[in-house]
Amino acid sequence: GCKKCGIPFEPTYLDSLIFAQNLLPELGKYKLDIVADHLQLPQFNHHRASDDAVPVAQMLAKFFVMLEERGVTRLQQINDEMTKLRPLGVKRNRFPKHIILIAKNKVGLKNLYQLISASNLKYFKRVPIIPKSELVAHREGLIIGSACEAGELFRAIVDHKDWNELKRIASFYDYLEIQPLGNNRFMVRDGTVRDDEDLKDFNRTVVKLGEELGKPVCATGDVHFLDPEDEVYRHILLASKKFADANEPVPLYFRTTDEMLKEFDYLGKEKAYEVVVTNTRAIAEQVEDIELLPKGKLFPPRLENSEEDLNRMVWGKAHELYGDDLPQLIVDRLNVELGSILGKYDVVYMSAQKLVQRSLECGYLVGSRGSVGSSLVAYMAGITEVNALPPHYRCPKCRNVEFHAGEYGCGADMPDKMCPVCGTKYAKDGFDIPFETFLGYGGGKVPDIDLNFSGEYQARAHAHAVEMFGKTQVFRAGTIGTLAEKTAYGFVKKYLEENGIAAGNAEIDRLTAGCVGVRRTTGQHPGGLVVVPDDMDIEDFCPVQHPADDPDSDTITTHFEYHCMEDNLLKLDMLGHDDPTMIRMLENLTGVNARAIPLDDPD
C-alpha cells in the first residue's frame, strides 16, 4: 500500500517466531497459543488478526526482558544473540535455500571447510544449513553463486517479488545462475507456471538483473550425472528413497558447450555466448590451483622432547639387551632407522609408545598389527614384541649374542642352547624382517602403526590419546558407506517390478553396476583417531561432522574418508579386540605371565 502511494516504508522488523524458537527451545512447538500459555499471557480470541496482535506484543515485551538478562540492550545486538542461541535451540532455518560456494584460494578453502563444519555440527536439521550471518563472516576467498531453482533469487522471481527486492537479493551474490528449461520444467507439470515461455522469462529476469547490477550471469547445468542415459540410475535411487516424483524426467546431465548454446538461443546469439562461455570462463579464471592435501607431507602433532626421548629410549634398550659394546649389525640397523624417523616421525613412535605403555601398566597386552614389526626401533621402544633382527641367540645375563642369519626362518625355530660365556640358557629371538617393509626404500613412506587394544580398555586408550594431544585436536576417522552390489540389485529389481518393466539379466546387471558405489551414508572407523597439530585447525585439512548425520551423537568425525589424509595427519589405529582381554583373564586364572611363555613351547 505504501509503495502504491509513493510513501517510503522500510521499518525495522522482528520475527517473534524466531525469538520463541531460540529463547524457548524446550517448547518444541511454537503455535501462538502454545507460546502464550507458556508465558502465562491473558486469554485471547485466537485466529482473529486484531486479537492475535495483542499477545504477540506481550510476548515481545517478555522476550526483551530475557534478552536484557543476556546483556542485549540494542536492536543491533539481536541478530548476533540469535545466532549464539540457535545451536542450543532448534538449530534450524525454516526455509533454507540452495547456494553455490566456490573456493578460489586457500583462504576460501578453509572458510568453506569451516562453513561445512558449522552446518553439520551447529545448524543441522535434516540437511546441513548455513545461516547467512555465518556465510558473511566467512566470505573471504569464496565465490558465491545464486544456484538453481531452489536458490533464494530464483524463488523470489517465481514468487513475483518486486524489482527492488530482487535487486537487493541479487546484490549479495558474486554471480547469478540460469539453467536449461528442462531442469525446471517440473514447474509446468505442477502448475506453478503455464509453459516454457514463463521459464524463459524467469531466466531473462536474471539476465536483466545481472546487467543492471553489473553481476556476471552464468549458464549452468546443475549436473547430477554424466550422460543422458544415466538418468535411469537417479530414478532407481530416488525410488528407493520413496520420492513420489522419482520417475519424473529431469535432464541433469553434463551438456556440451554446443548443447548449452542451443539451450539459451532465445537470449540471442551474443548473450547466449556470454552466459555460456565468457562469464563461466571468467569465474573459473578467478580460482587458483589449490592443492587440497600436500602429497606425502606429514603434519605431526607435537610431543615435548619426543625426538630426544625416542633416541634415548631406543639406545638404552639396545644396550640393556645386547651389551655395552653393541654388535655392528644392530648399530647399523638402528642408525638407518633412526635416520629416517627422528625429526620426521618421532611423534608417531612416541605417541604409540605412550599408549602401549599405559595399557601395559593397566594389565592389558597390546597387539601390534601390520608391518610395524619390521621396525627395530619400534621393538626397542616397546611398541611391538616382534624383533626384526635376523635369528639370534641372546644371553639375558651377560648379554652375549650369536647371530645365525640364513640358517633359520626365525629365532623360535632354533634349538635350545646355553651361553658359552656364563652358562645361562640363551633367549631365542629375531624374525629377520627388513625395515623397508615399514617405511619403504629410503624411508619415504609415512609410518602407520596399528595397535590392537583390549575391548575392555579401548575407550580408556582413546581417552589417553585425547589427554596427550587435546580434545580440540583429536577426531574420529570418518568413513563413507557406499551402495553394495546386493543392495543395488534389490533396488533395481524393485524399481523394475513397481514400474512394470521387463528386463533381462544383462540389463539388470547393467543397471545394478550403475548404482553400485554411490555414497549412502557416513560413519566412523572402529578404532581410528586423527590428530591435528596444536598450531593448526582441523579445517586446514578437512571439515568435520557427526557420523551418519546424527546431530545427537557426541562423536565428531572427519568429513572426508580418512584414507585420503593418512599421509598428512597422524592417524592412531586403536582397535578393540578380544585377544588381549582373554589373555589377561588367562593370566589371572593361571598366574602365568603370557610374555614369559617361549614361542617354541610344545605345550
Regions found by a protein language model. Give the residues of each.
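Mg2+-dependent phosphoryl-transfer active-site scaffold
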Residues: 65-314, 355-356, 365, 383-603
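Helix-rich "cap/lid" substructures immediately adjacent to catalytic or cofactor-binding pockets
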Residues: 324-367
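Substrate-recognition/cap helix-loop segment adjacent to the acidic, metal-dependent catalytic center
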Residues: 1-12, 155, 164-166, 170, ...
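Acidic, Mg2+-coordinating catalytic module of metal-dependent nucleases/exonucleases
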Residues: 1-2, 25-82
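Conserved beta-strand -> loop -> alpha-helix junction used to position metal-binding or nucleic-acid-contacting
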Residues: 8-21, 77, 101, 144
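Catalytic DNA-binding helix-loop module of base-excision-repair DNA glycosylases/AP lyases
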Residues: 1, 358-360, 371-383
